[in-house]
């Protein structure tokens, strides 16, 4: 490509997203600066996802299409390989990008010198009662707080992310795991990268009944992911000097961190 490299590449994998892709793409393009690109990976789509995108006439939009299904991690790695920006941001094909997102995030990542920066999300969907909206608490997480929170849960909303292309390269992209985002944040923290979450809202995050992370099969695969739990154990050793239980129960893990027999962290 002979055009100058953009400042920002936004990557979006999509599989059969005909009902939501146009809104996701348009809201992202509206929020992006002029010197940015939106890369969308069509992962073996069999519906009208491509036709919906072809109705959008914007030179910043690039479509990559695969006939064989890759899955999220492989699709994201294919997008990272094509991205030309110094900064990389994520979006999902069923979410909505808020208009101020990139203006705010570009300012903050430059100011904080973070390797990876996240925003907060407003959850939306018919299953959320009574109004269909549920904002996350607008709380900032410092790099130190974020690293500790990773031992308890995944505190970061993946499609709210913006990070440096250099950081993505050092991490080697995404690994094939049920929780490819959580795995990457654990590895980034273990590598000493500066990750933080700003208090402001970046996206509207769609919640629906057939969400992958709510399915029993996905949860079973996650429990068997030894590589992820090893990375989590390594991070616990690096931060705390002791292991934490494998149980996912928040109270058990919190007790292990704050009530260590050497006095914990306080």
Q: In which residue ranges do the predicted regions lie?
A:
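N-proximal low-complexity "stem/linker" segments adjacent to membrane-targeting elements
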Residues: 1-27
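Cell-envelope/extracellular polymer assembly enzymes that use nucleotide-activated donors
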Residues: 6-9, 37, 183
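Short, acidic, metal-binding catalytic loop of nucleotide-sugar glycosyltransferases
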Residues: 26-35
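A conserved acidic beta->alpha catalytic loop
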Residues: 42-51, 68, 92
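Glycine-rich, basic loop-to-helix element that forms the pyrophosphate-binding segment
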Residues: 66-83, 104
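Short aromatic/hydrophobic "clamp" motif used to bind/position activated sugar donors
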Residues: 88
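Conserved donor NDP-sugar-binding/catalytic core segment of glycosyltransferases
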Residues: 100-132
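Conserved nucleotide-sugar donor-binding catalytic segment
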Residues: 141-224
């Amino acid at each position: 490509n002979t055009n100058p490299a953009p400042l920002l590449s936004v990557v979006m994998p999509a599989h059969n997203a005909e009902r939501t892709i146009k809104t996701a793409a348009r809201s992202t393009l509206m929020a992006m600066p002029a010197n940015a690109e939106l890369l969308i990976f069509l992962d073996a789509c069999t519906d009208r996802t491509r036709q919906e995108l072809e109705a959008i006439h914007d030179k910043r939009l690039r479509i990559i299409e695969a006939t064989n299904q890759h899955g999220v991690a492989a699709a994201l790695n294919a997008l990272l390989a094509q991205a030309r920006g110094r900064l990389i941001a994520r979006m999902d094909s069923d979410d909505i990008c808020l208009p101020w997102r990139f203006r705010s995030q570009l300012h903050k990542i430059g100011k904080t010198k973070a390797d990876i920066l996240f925003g907060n999300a407003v959850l939306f969907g018919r299953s959320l009662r009574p109004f269909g909206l549920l904002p996350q608490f607008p709380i900032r997480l410092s790099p130190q707080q974020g690293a500790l929170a990773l031992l308890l849960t995944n505190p970061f909303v993946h499609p709210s992310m913006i990070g440096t292309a250099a950081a993505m390269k050092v991490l080697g992209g995404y690994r094939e795991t049920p929780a490819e985002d959580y795995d990457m944040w654990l590895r980034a923290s273990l590598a000493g990268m500066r990750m933080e979450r700003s208090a402001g809202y970046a996206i509207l995050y769609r919640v629906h009944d057939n969400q992958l992370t709510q399915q029993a099969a996905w949860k079973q695969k996650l429990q068997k992911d030894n590589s992820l739990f090893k990375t989590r154990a390594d991070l616990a050793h690096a931060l705390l000097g002791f292991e934490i239980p494998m149980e996912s129960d928040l109270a058990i893990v919190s007790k292990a961190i704050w009530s260590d027999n050497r006095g914990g962290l306080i």
